[in-house]
Amino acid sequence: MLIKKIFIVVFAFYLTACGFHLRGALDLPAGLKDVYLDGGSDMFRDQFKRVMENSSIQLANSPEHAGLIVHIFNEDNRRQILSLSSGGAANEFELDYNVQFEVLDSHSKVLLARESMDVKRDYFNNQQAILAKDNEEMTIRGEMYQQAVRGIVSRIRVVLESSAHK
């Protein structure tokens, strides 16, 4: 029993030493500890909150208590038909999600001027499983929101790391 406990502890140390992180966790700089999210749709906010929690980052309740403020200005979801069947039904769609944002520090200084993040995905529309397609589209949209959040966080990381080296 003691050998098993020792093995578990040693294995845990090896995992952390090699840089292993749980899925969804991001390695973020110290400057990104308390973040306030201003704006955004419910789905975007849910994904943002999930990514922050997985990365051990606190979401501040107000901008006054935040080290960083992420302003979401505009979100746009589009769906475009890419191909049609011989009967005229849509076979393939392209989903497009665009979000505009900027990042401020705790003193309202602009760290990242207004930028746009664009995520696109295609998916096949099986005419035999119409109900399942709605669920598939919602799942894909959730993944698109998550990809956008990760892209925004990556841009923030680059800005914080470059300002730390100055």
What do the PLM-derived regions correspond to, one by one?
Residues 71-116, 122-138:
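Surface-exposed short loop/turn segments
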Residues 131-166:
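C-terminal/domain-edge helix-coil "capping" segments
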Residues 23-26:
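Acidic, polar-rich low-complexity tracts and alpha-helical solenoid repeat scaffolds
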